[in-house]
Amino acid sequence: MQIPNTFNINAKANIYLPIHSEEALVEALQQHKNPFVLGGGSNMLLTQDITQPVLHILLKGISIVKENNDNVWIKAQAGENWHQFVQYTLSQGYGGLENLSLIYGNVGTTPVQNIGAYGVEIKDVMESCEAINIHTLQKRNFTNAECSFGYRESIFKGKEKGNYIITAVTFKLTKRNHLLHTEYGAIQQLLAERGLSSPTPKQLSEVIISIRQSKLPNPDTLGNCGSFFKNPIISKTNYEELKIQYPDIPSYSIDETQVKVPAGWLIDRAGLKGYRKGDAGVHNLQALVLVNYGKATGKEILAVAHYVQATVLKQFGITLEFEVNIF
């Protein structure tokens, strides 16, 4: 069968096993070694058929672990749709996940990538996650600190890569005195247009959704996996040198010696926004997004990605790293 993926790549699985419980997961791991673990299919590019057994993690359920007057600790099973979960928490009046609205994928993969948007990352809101060791079948609880979070990085992409399958994630959210992140220009502008000087988490989420919908394609209608490249982090010295030639190059300060530069701006300035080769290309509104216009193969999209990398490196001397996982 075709492996579900938001790039809409026609890649097939020899063995496909939908997993709806931890018991089913353990049983599948006893029978199938070296599995291919599938979540929401939203952060990967398939360049070939998958010969390994595909375990599709579909565990469902949302529950409150504990709460007090200020906070609530809420657990979501790995197969819960991320955006739907975010909207559920907002409907309950909880704050913390609003900036992460309309990110495609499932709950279980969010700690792996340490997903982030508009100044908020999973590391800022995750309390812990539960995972099963693929080799020993033992269950383990990882605290936030034990996940070794970095920019689009975690222990699950580093030291423990391929060793664990996340089954549930617990988030610490606010019930009052919400700390809202509205520092991005587009957010401030839209809040002002809507007359929202003190927005609720739900109102901020609606603004974020509006911004994302205005520039990001819906994978249901145009195959993509959101941001394909990481925003590169460069030295301030390098940035100041680039600023001489490109005075309008934007940046976000990381620390005293480093800044983050938007990859989308670099790709756009390199003249690649809207670039297309066959059915693979760079989106015409958001250069950070690669798209499948119809029947592109994973290899064709990867070729476009490599072309983008080479062009940006030649023009700016900056190497763009992939945010997506390539298989």
Residue ranges and their predicted role:
Residues 3-9, 139-290, 295-299, 315-327:
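Phosphate/pyrophosphate- and phosphate-bearing ligand-binding catalytic cores of soluble enzymes
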Residues 1-135:
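Anion-binding (especially nucleotide phosphate/pyrophosphate-binding) glycine-rich loop
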Residues 28-32, 183-187, 304-308:
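Short amphipathic alpha-helices in soluble, non-transmembrane regions
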